[in-house]
C-alpha cells in the first residue's frame, strides 16, 4: 500500500513521534497527559505534562496512557493524541486519506484495535494501516523493504523489546518481550534501594542507566541524589557501574537469550543476510552502553546501533507513509 498524504505515528510507551507526509517529523514528546481531577479537562500534553509528574498540584493527575507498548487507558490516549495532532496543525482532510501507526510485533488484535480506536476518536473516517515496529525499524535503518534480503532487528523500546528477522517487507521470525527501558529504570531503582538504602526518582535512574550501562569492571561510578530510605532526607551517593550492571543483568540476559533463540530458528536462506547485514539495534534501549557488545559476544555476529535509534521506527513509518514499496500489509481498519 502506498500513501501520498497523511500521518505516521509511533505511539510509544515513553515517547510519541508524529510525522506528516511532505513535512517530516513534527512531534517528538513524552507520551504523557495531565488532567484536571475534578473536570477531566486537559491541562497539558507531552513535555509539559511529563514535567509535572511527581510534582503535580493536588487537583492535577499526570497519566502515561501506554504500557508495554500498547494502550492501557483509551480515553487518555485519545485525548493525548488529539493534543499532539492539533499542535501538528494536521488538516482534517489529510487524515481522511491514511494513517500509518506502529505497533509492537507481539500486540494482540484487541490491542491493535484499541490503537485504531484512539485515532478514530481524534479524526473519524480515516484508514489506519498497522505496521509492526520491527518492519518500520528496518525501513528507518535504511533497508529497502522491496528487496528480499533479511535483516535482524532488535528494537528496545520503553515497554517492549522486539527481536525480529524482517525480509521482503514482512516479519519472518519474531519474539516480543514485555520488558524495555522502563523495566531497566525500575530495576535500578529497586537495586539501589536494597543495596544502598537510597530512594531514586525515575530521571536519576535513567541517568545511571545511560551513563554507566553494563560497565561492570568496577571502574565506573556516578554521583546521584536521592532520599535516604531510613531518615527520609536528601542524600548524595556515588553509584558504581558494577551495581547498575547487577540491576540490569536479568533484563539484558532475557534480551540476549531471545536473540540467541531467534538465531537458532533462522531460515538457512536468510542466515547469510543476517551475518553480513549485522544485528541492528534500534529504540532508546539500544543506547544502553555495552548492550551491543554483549549481544555480539554472545552470538558471534556483529551488532551495531542504528543512526538516531530513538527515531528509527518513526523514520521508517514516515518512509512507509510516503513510499510504502514492498510493505506486506497488516490489518487495515476503515473508519
Model-derived segments and their meaning:
Residues 1-154, 166-280, 286-335:
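Nucleotide/phosphate-binding catalytic cleft detector across ATP-hydrolyzing
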Amino acid at each position: 500500500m502506498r500513501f501520498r498524504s497523511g500521518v505516521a505515528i509511533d505511539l510509544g510507551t515513553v515517547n510519541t513521534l508524529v510525522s506528516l507526509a511532505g513535512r517530516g517529523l513534527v512531534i517528538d514528546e513524552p507520551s504523557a497527559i495531565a488532567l484536571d481531577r475534578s473536570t477531566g479537562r486537559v491541562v497539558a500534553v507531552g513535555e509539559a505534562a511529563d514535567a509535572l509528574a511527581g510534582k503535580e498540584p493536588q487537583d492535577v493527575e499526570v497519566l502515561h496512557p501506554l504500557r508495554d507498548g500498547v494502550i492501557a487507558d483509551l480515553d487518555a490516549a485519545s485525548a493525548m493524541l488529539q493534543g499532539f495532532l492539533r499542535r501538528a496543525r494536521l488538516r482534517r482532510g489529510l487524515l481522511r486519506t491514511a494513517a500509518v501507526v506502529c505497533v509492537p510485533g507481539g500486540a494482540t488484535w484487541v490491542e491493535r484495535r484499541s490503537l485504531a480506536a484512539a485515532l478514530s476518536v481524534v479524526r473519524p473516517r480515516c484508514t489506519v494501516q498497522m505496521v509492526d515496529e520491527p518492519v518500520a525499524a528496518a525501513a528507518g535503518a535504511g533497508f529497502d523493504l522491496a528487496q528480499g534480503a533479511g535483516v535482524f532487528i532488535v528494537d528496545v523500546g520503553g515497554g517492549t523489546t522486539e527481536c525480529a528477522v524482517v525480509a521482503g517487507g514482512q516479519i519472518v521470525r519474531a519474539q516480543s518481550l514485555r520488558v524495555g527501558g522502563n523495566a531497566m529504570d525500575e530495576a535500578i531503582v529497586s537495586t539501589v534501594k536494597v543495596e544502598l538504602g537510597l530512594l531514586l526518582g525515575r530521571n536519576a535512574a535513567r541517568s545511571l542507566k545511560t551513563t554507566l550501562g553494563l560497565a561492570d569492571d568496577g571502574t565506573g561510578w556516578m554521583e546521584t541524589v536521592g532520599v535516604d530510605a531510613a531518615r527520609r532526607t536528601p542524600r548524595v551517593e556515588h553509584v558504581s557501574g558494577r551495581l547498575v550492571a547487577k540491576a540490569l543483568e536479568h533484563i539484558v540476559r532475557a534480551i540476549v537469550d531471545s536473540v540467541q533463540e531467534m538465531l537458532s530458528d533462522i531460515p538457512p536462506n536468510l542466515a547469510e543476510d543476517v551475518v553480513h547485514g549485522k544485528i541492528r539495534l534500534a529504540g532508546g534501549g539500544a543506547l544502553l552502553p555495552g548492550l551491543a557488545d554483549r549481544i555480539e559476544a554472545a552470538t558471534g555476529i556483529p551488532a551495531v546501533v542504528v543512526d538516531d535509534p530513538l527515531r528509527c521506527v518513526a523514520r521508517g513509518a514516515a518512509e512507509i507513509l510516503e513510499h510504502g514499496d514492498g510493505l506486506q500489509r497488516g490489518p487495515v481498519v476503515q473508519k
